[in-house]
Amino acid sequence: MKRLVIYVHGKGGSAEEAKHYRPLFAESDVIGFDYHAQTPWEAKYEFPRFFDLHSKGYDSVILIANSIGAYFSMNALAGKKLSRAMFISPIVDMERLITDIMMWAKVTEAELESKKEISTEFGETLSWEYLCYVRKYPIRWSIPTRILYGGKDHLTSRETISGFADRIGADLTVMEDGEHWFHTEEQMNVLDHWISNSIRPL
């Protein structure tokens, strides 16, 4: 069986991160997706074209996606033929994240609607168009999925990730000392072990 693994990075990441996963998928082709999309509607255009171009000739395609890369993937690739997905610290409720950022920045919905975009002191720009989009197009995902979540994730609550996993029937693994960004030696060891276990049949 000819198998392709597509890796989708998170914010600030790069397609080069796919190299980390190649030893874990020795009998598969592993590629990283160096996407340019900054919004889910841009991803909806860009992601399917990448998938269609690179998945030709493969019997099985596995998706590994990180953080907002997972959100963009679920928004754009739900209708594609994926054998399974593995999400690391996925953003699964973008509306909740945006409203949380609004609360942290003390921005009301009326203010955002009026100004359309508001920059925050912690580097995120709030967008009324973005908020309206995520409300209009909620995530619908039925691909067999496994999720790795850090107990200290500051962007997605335990309640949110557990509820999402239950809703889509995903297997959820929690590393209590893990953060949103898995990067320490211990965290990466847990990630690698989780990937190895996830390769087995779901």
Regions found by a protein language model. Give the residues of each.
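Gly/Ala-rich beta-loop-alpha elbow adjacent to hydrolase catalytic centers
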Residues: 64-73
